[in-house]
Amino acid sequence: MGVPTLFKKIISNKFYKNIHKGIRDGQTKCNYFFMDYNGIVYNAYENIKKDIEENNYSKDKIEHLVLEEVINITKKLICTVIQPSKITYIALDGPAPRAKMVQQRSRRYKAVMEKDFMKELKNKFKINESKDIWDRSANISPGTEFMEKLSNRIIKAMKEKTFQTHNKNMKVIFNNGNTPGEGEHKFLGLLRDMRKMESKKDDKIYVIINSSQMGET
């Protein structure tokens, strides 16, 4: 639930002179890297969607491919593109407030109705329909079996030091989907606490990937 075009407006505003509009692999200094993770999961699915559609994969196989693609994207972002020196904070969306749950339910009911309507039209006019074996919206939601698998896969990668950069002092913190609140709310709370504790002399640089704004810039 992002504010449309907000991030694009901020980085295009001359007032925010300290905001980098582009990051080259390993060439932009970064101390803290915050990842609102749900958007990365969606991107991972899109990356392998064609392969899934061309092959008769089982549900378990699809989920395995999505999980491994998520880990590959995460490793590239942390170890090659951003290379944070101090902390990487990965946050999954947890249970939403009741008001948002109601809104999400309404939106998903509408999406199902539209999908059924489009299916009827395609059948009527004999248009080939691509198979949607794995419903990403239903699976990439707090409390699902897939999100539990994702949490376990991230924890495994952390134990295996998959996300370790050349800086051995860099720590990876993972906040899973069992904690209430959206990913950005979780790390913004941590950011506020860090700002209170930090010295004014310290030059800290933060990089934030937000799920609702990833495709905007």
Identify the function of each model-found stretch.
Residues 1-217:
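Noncatalytic, typically N-terminal accessory segments of nucleic acid-processing enzymes
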